[in-house]
Regions:
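Short, strongly hydrophobic alpha-helical membrane anchors
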Residues: 1-10, 136-138
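Single transmembrane alpha-helix segments in multi-pass membrane proteins
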Residues: 7-59, 82, 86-98, 234-242
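Hydrophobic core segments of alpha-helical transmembrane domains in multi-pass membrane transport
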Residues: 51-55, 73-79, 106-114, 152-161, ...
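Transmembrane helix-bundle core of multi-pass membrane transporters
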Residues: 61, 90-91, 95-166, 193, ...
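Transmembrane alpha-helical segments in multi-pass inner-membrane proteins
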Residues: 62-74, 195-275, 280
Length: 291
């Protein structure tokens, strides 16, 4: 019984760490899809880019880990502004099929570029000494870096919630998600809002990709291998919501860890079955708005 409880705590802890990473990466996709109505399947490319920025900055240039996290966010956010202005903005009025084909094409290009520059091997993550080893908590030892992931991501969740719920920018985002035409009629510059929100969501994906590089391997196939997880978080949580993807990411992180620990022969199949069941029950997601 004691061994089972220990494994239960371990699964919950590691699942929570994975869930927090999935949330930091996916929440931007949820908000931008709810705000812009753009089917951006290339969101994982931004997470992969953040992972490469972090690992390259640390291993090749000796950048301290905290600064490397900042660089991952800033570089990806800046690159996303260029892509949004040059490419994405031209397809806002396009059909869903055209948007899907465009973003899948971006994935193929990003994968080819990553493979050309870095090869096919997983990028190693060099952690600072203070994030190595174990952290004692409630009489148990947990990996210090996983504890850091949970705490740091929790702070990011709080800051994001404050930004969306308690600032003028957040009020404009919520108004535009609810009714874009009405938001434009009262003077909200939706084009500029789209760019800023897209940059924030992409930057968070880059930050999550770098932060979670020790959990979700950074390699050229990253956008394809993890696309389903990001879409499941968004679809189960609901578009345009902060709370929904948070709950969905934690559930999926814990469920994925539990399946790999207790039912490795089934892989992620139980998660897909549960996702289908939830969407049949609530097509708009757990916290999404019904049409």
């Amino acid at each position: 019984m004691e061994a089972f409880l220990a494994s239960l705590v371990s699964v919950a802890f590691h699942g929570a760490a994975l869930g927090m990473i999935l949330y930091v990466i996916s929440v931007g996709l949820s908000v931008t899809m709810g705000l812009m109505g753009f089917a951006n399947l290339a969101h994982g490319v931004f997470a992969m880019a953040g992972g490469y920025v972090l690992t390259t900055a640390i291993s090749r240039f000796g950048v301290p880990f905290p600064l490397a996290l900042v660089l991952a966010f800033a570089f990806v956010a800046a690159a996303s502004v260029v892509l949004e202005r040059l490419l994405y903005s031209r397809l806002y009025a396009a059909s869903d099929l055209e948007q899907v084909l465009f973003t899948i094409g971006l994935i193929f290009i990003a994968v080819a570029v990553a493979r050309f520059i870095y090869g096919t091997l997983q990028q190693p993550v060099v952690l600072p000494d203070y994030l190595k080893g174990q952290f004692a908590l409630l009489g148990r030892d947990f990996p210090a870096y996983r504890v850091f992931i949970i705490v740091f991501s929790g702070v990011m969740v709080g800051l994001l919630w404050f930004g969306v719920e308690r600032t003028r920018w957040g009020a404009m985002v919520r108004a535009t998600v609810d009714n874009r035409a009405m938001a434009q009629s009262v003077g909200i510059d939706t084009k500029r809002l789209f760019t800023l929100t897209f940059a924030l969501g992409s930057g968070l994906a880059g930050l999550g990709g770098g932060l979670g590089a020790e959990i979700i391997a950074i390699q050229p196939s990253y956008p394809f291998e993890n696309l389903v997880y990001f879409l499941v978080v968004v679809s189960v949580g609901g578009l345009g919501s902060l709370r929904g993807p948070f709950v969905a990411a934690l559930l999926i992180g814990i469920a994925d860890t539990a399946c790999k620990y207790w039912l490795p022969q089934y892989g992620a199949f139980p998660i897909y079955v549960a996702t289908i069941a939830i969407l049949l029950w609530r097509p708009a997601g757990l916290f999404g708005r019904r049409a």
